[in-house]
């Protein structure tokens, strides 16, 4: 092989060079464009796929928001964590992982409420059929995603921008698809740039503990 290459070089024939510019390589997918003149959709409000249990919990926390105890957090498909005063991104081809489906009810159906006094972020979560892991149950990775999203939102609302440094999940009881669970997270302590949080996932009626977790976040600004 080496002798053959040497002969080609000796005769002035150049071997083809592999293109190293990654930007010139064709993509394996095409991202559709979602340009719209309409106001961005808030996914954190009820739609027709929400079950009675999810609606009941939503209404319960909305009642708490009237007294100022809880505050509903808007949810958009192009913003990781909504911050008041910062308009949601529009005309963006990328989508937030938990809001990347066009059909309601088949993936991540959830809404979040924040309690500033208790440093708690609660997420009401109804997993759809596209999140299946073991037959009939929610994939563990999807559960971890929602824990990361909920604890991260709580850290952001208390401390500003953060990044996940560590996530430890203890799965205790599987979560059936279509059921409603409460993801209850709390910022436990802050040490310098480190934000320590805890989290539990319980059934809608608090009768079963599905998951426990801890997460460590690092504040982006000192």
Swiss-Prot record:
Pfam families listed in its UniProt record: 4HBT
What EC number(s) does the entry state?
A: 3.1.2.2
Q: Please list the residues that bind substrate.
A: 172, 193-194
What protein does this entry describe?
A: Acyl-coenzyme A thioesterase THEM4
Which family does the record claim for this protein?
Belongs to the THEM4/THEM5 thioesterase family.
- In the UniProt record, does the keyword Transferase occur? no
The record gives the membrane topology as: Peripheral membrane protein
User: Where is the catalytic site?
Assistant: 148 (proton donor/acceptor)
Q: Which UniProt keywords apply?
A: Apoptosis, Cell membrane, Cell projection, Cytoplasm, Fatty acid metabolism, Hydrolase, Lipid metabolism, Membrane, Mitochondrion, Mitochondrion inner membrane, Transit peptide
Where in or outside the cell it occurs: the entry states: Cell membrane; Cell projection, Ruffle membrane; Cytoplasm; Mitochondrion
Share an example GO biological-process annotation for this protein.
fatty acid metabolic process
Q: Does the keyword Endoplasmic reticulum apply?
A: no
Please give the Gene Ontology molecular function terms for this protein: hydrolase activity
């Amino acid at each position: 092989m080496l002798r053959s290459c040497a002969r080609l070089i000796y005769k002035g024939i150049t071997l083809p060079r592999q293109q190293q510019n990654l930007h010139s390589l064709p993509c394996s997918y095409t991202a559709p464009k979602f340009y719209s003149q309409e106001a961005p959709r808030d996914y954190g409000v009820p739609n027709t796929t929400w079950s009675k249990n999810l609606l009941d919990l939503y209404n319960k926390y909305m009642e708490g928001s009237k007294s100022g105890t809880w505050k509903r957090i808007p949810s958009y498909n192009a913003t990781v964590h909504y911050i008041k005063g910062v308009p949601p991104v529009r005309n963006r081809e990328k989508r937030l992982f938990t809001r990347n489906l066009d059909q309601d009810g088949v993936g991540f159906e959830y809404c979040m409420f924040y309690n500033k006094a208790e440093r708690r972020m609660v997420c009401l979560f109804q997993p759809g059929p596209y999140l299946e892991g073991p037959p009939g149950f929610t994939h563990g990775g999807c559960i971890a995603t929602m824990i990361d999203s909920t604890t991260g939102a709580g850290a952001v609302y208390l401390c500003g921008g953060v990044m996940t440094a560590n996530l430890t999940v203890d799965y205790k009881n599987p979560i059936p698809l279509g059921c409603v669970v409460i993801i209850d997270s709390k910022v436990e302590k802050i040490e310098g740039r480190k934000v320590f949080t805890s989290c539990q996932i319980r059934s809608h009626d608090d009768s079963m503990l599905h998951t426990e977790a801890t997460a460590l976040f690092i504040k982006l600004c000192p």
